[in-house]
């Protein structure tokens, strides 16, 4: 039986179509995925992300532990509340999960990990934390609501008290602050400004209803996927998994190679991959009629006349742009155009950077 978040009843009251998402009953949409998508791009929408896992890490060696566990380097985190995005890799350089880590104090950090990878993540973290004496607390007592869009922060702030409004005033992206009952972070998965707000389970339903009253539109998994794809954001198990290097998933920027003497899990394998080369993640745009779908083959001929084939990892119709877009993992050497096989048709596509929309506008 699939689990329910504390907001399940609110979803049904809002008319959601519920689906099983990695063992959780979650809203796919509330009537119109397209309307929900546009609400986030032009105004404010919200998502129940309570199925994601918040993990608090405490102990005097927590920073040392995370510098070993993660490919990105938490030594960069020196201001309380600052966050960074990182892959958590296995010894062969594959991605166990991608996550966000927050720094609060030298002996207190917080991770937010994906729902689909929860059990293996917790097992991996626990296994490697033991020698460092880390206390691990899984925060199943918290729900999380993502409020996203150009008006999201202003509308969410109408629910905050004076101290909470003061706490978030001027807060830059990728920061989080505990303000009363609310943990408020300037993070998201849409390419828009907004907050991800964690709060006690028993207060989540009232907060959700108050956001609806404030004019924030409930949004489901369908819009979440088209929004993140337009923003060029990876989805675990599609753009990367335990067999795929972050170098082949447009995550090279999340690997902290310096200092060279920092030993993190997967480093040796990554260095070999960097030397020998890997596939890469690119964007594809198809303005002709049709939709680019996951797992369709992508073919191209390189400058030397050699033929190559890659694969679409995520594809959809872009509601913001009005045509089809995709992320694709392809061999090195791809040029500005390629061919995608859609049934019995060979469709020309333009090859772009793996990002299509930022802050509601097309990325040139």
UniProtKB/Swiss-Prot annotation:
Subunit-level organization: The glycine cleavage system is composed of four proteins: P, T, L and H.
Any Pfam family the entry gives: GCV_T
Lineage, opening ranks: Bacteria, Pseudomonadati, Pseudomonadota, Gammaproteobacteria, Enterobacterales
Function: The glycine cleavage system catalyzes the degradation of glycine.
Annotated protein name in UniProt: Aminomethyltransferase
A GO CC annotation given for this chain: cytosol
Family listed: Belongs to the GcvT family.
One GO BP annotation of this record: glycine decarboxylation via glycine cleavage system
Listed GO MF terms: aminomethyltransferase activity; transaminase activity
E.C. numbers: 2.1.2.10
Keyword vocabulary terms for this entry: Aminotransferase, Transferase
Gene: gcvT
Family matches, as InterPro entries: GCS_T (IPR006223), GCS_T_bac (IPR022903), GCST_C (IPR013977), GCV_T_N (IPR006222), GcvT/YgfZ/DmdA (IPR028896), GcvT/YgfZ_C (IPR029043), TrmE/GcvT_dom1 (IPR027266)
Catalytic activity: N(6)-[(R)-S(8)-aminomethyldihydrolipoyl]-L-lysyl-[protein] + (6S)-5,6,7,8-tetrahydrofolate = N(6)-[(R)-dihydrolipoyl]-L-lysyl-[protein] + (6R)-5,10-methylene-5,6,7,8-tetrahydrofolate + NH4(+)
């Amino acid at each position: 039986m699939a689990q329910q978040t504390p907001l399940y009843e609110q979803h049904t009251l809002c008319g959601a179509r519920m689906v099983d998402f990695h063992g959780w009953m979650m809203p796919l949409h509330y009537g119109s995925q397209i309307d929900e998508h546009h609400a986030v791009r032009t105004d404010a929408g919200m998502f129940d992300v309570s199925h994601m896992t918040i993990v608090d890490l405490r102990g005097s060696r927590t920073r040392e532990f995370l510098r070993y566990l993660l490919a990105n380097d938490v030594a960069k985190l020196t201001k309380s509340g600052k966050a960074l995005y990182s892959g958590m890799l296995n010894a062969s350089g594959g991605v166990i999960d991608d996550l966000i880590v927050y720094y609060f104090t030298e002996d207190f950090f917080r991770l937010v990990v994906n729902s689909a990878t929860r059990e293996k993540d917790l097992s991996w973290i626990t296994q490697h934390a033991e020698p460092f004496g880390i206390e691990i607390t899984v925060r199943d007592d918290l729900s999380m609501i993502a409020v996203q869009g150009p008006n999201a922060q202003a509308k969410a702030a109408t629910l905050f008290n004076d101290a909470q409004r003061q706490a978030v005033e001027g807060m830059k992206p990728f920061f989080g602050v505990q303000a009363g009952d609310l943990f408020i972070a300037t993070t998201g998965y849409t390419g828009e400004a907004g907050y991800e707000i964690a709060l006690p389970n028993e207060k989540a339903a009232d907060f959700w209803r108050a956001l609806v009253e404030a004019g924030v539109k409930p949004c489901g998994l369908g819009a979440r996927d088209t929004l993140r794809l337009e923003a060029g954001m990876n989805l675990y198990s599609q753009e990367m998994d335990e067999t795929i290097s972050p170098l082949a998933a447009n995550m090279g920027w999340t690997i902290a190679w310096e200092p060279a003497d920092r030993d993190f899990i997967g480093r040796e394998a990554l260095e070999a991959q960097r030397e020998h080369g890997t596939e890469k993640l690119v964007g594809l745009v198809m303005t002709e009629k049709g939709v680019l779908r996951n797992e369709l083959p992508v073919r191209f001929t390189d400058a030397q006349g050699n033929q190559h084939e890659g694969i679409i990892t995520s594809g959809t119709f872009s509601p913001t742009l009005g045509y089809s877009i995709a992320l694709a993992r392809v061999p090195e050497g791809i040029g500005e155009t390629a061919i995608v096989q859609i049934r019995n048709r060979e469709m020309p596509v333009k090859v772009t950077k793996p990002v299509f929309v930022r802050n509601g506008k097309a990325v040139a």
